[in-house]
């Protein structure tokens, strides 16, 4: 849904009449993944459906029907969604939505740098990063689960695609991916 919100924000910033025509639809899309009012009887959507305020990042499915719990592989898509909220909030003058987007973006980026990219070198264990075992010599986790991390994608074991799942789409909101020159 983040792709739709981001695109809608881009159009809305250039064509204010777009908002008048499509605001209700866009607000429904946002509500589905980013409802920020807890215990709101007027909302048909759960509070921050895919985002865990405890973990500080999104989960791909929002459920834990896997042996290792929830999972998230496309951290960059989540970040793109939060950037879309910021832009849409700006385009519509909705300060609450802008603030929510800023919180989610900053929190998700911090978690991605920690859990996926391990930029401080204190999350991924030596067996994973230093050549001991089947998951040896990986500089990052491509998929984070509730109970493990892996270097894989659902459809391939090709490294370029595995890397790509956590950097695409590349937008101005992707600056975090290049902020650490050593990584």
PLM feature spans:
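Short, solvent-exposed segments of well-ordered alpha helices
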Residues: 20, 65-75
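Well-ordered alpha-helical segments within folded domains of soluble proteins
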Residues: 1-10, 73-87, 139-140
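Ser/Thr/Asn(+Pro)-rich, low-complexity disordered segments
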Residues: 1, 23-63, 67, 86-96, ...
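Substrate-binding cleft of carbohydrate-active enzyme catalytic domains
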Residues: 5-29
């Amino acid at each position: 849904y983040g792709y739709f919100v981001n695109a809608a924000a881009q159009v809305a910033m250039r064509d204010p009449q777009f908002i008048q025509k499509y605001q209700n639809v866009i607000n429904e899309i946002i509500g589905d993944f980013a409802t920020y009012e807890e215990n709101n009887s007027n909302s048909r959507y759960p509070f921050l459906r895919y985002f865990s305020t405890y973990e500080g990042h999104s989960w791909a499915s929002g459920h834990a029907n896997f042996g290792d719990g929830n999972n998230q592989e496309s951290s960059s898509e989540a970040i793109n969604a939060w950037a879309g909220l910021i832009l849409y909030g700006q385009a519509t003058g909705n300060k609450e939505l802008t603030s929510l987007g800023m919180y989610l973006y900053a929190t998700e980026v911090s978690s991605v740098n920690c859990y996926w990219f391990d930029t401080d070198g204190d999350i991924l264990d030596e067996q994973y990063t230093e050549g001991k075992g089947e998951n040896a010599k990986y500089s990052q986790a491509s998929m984070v689960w509730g109970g493990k991390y892996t270097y894989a994608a659902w459809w391939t074991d090709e490294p370029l695609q595995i890397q790509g799942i956590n950097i695409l789409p590349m937008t101005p909101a992707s600056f975090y991916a290049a902020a650490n020159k050593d990584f």
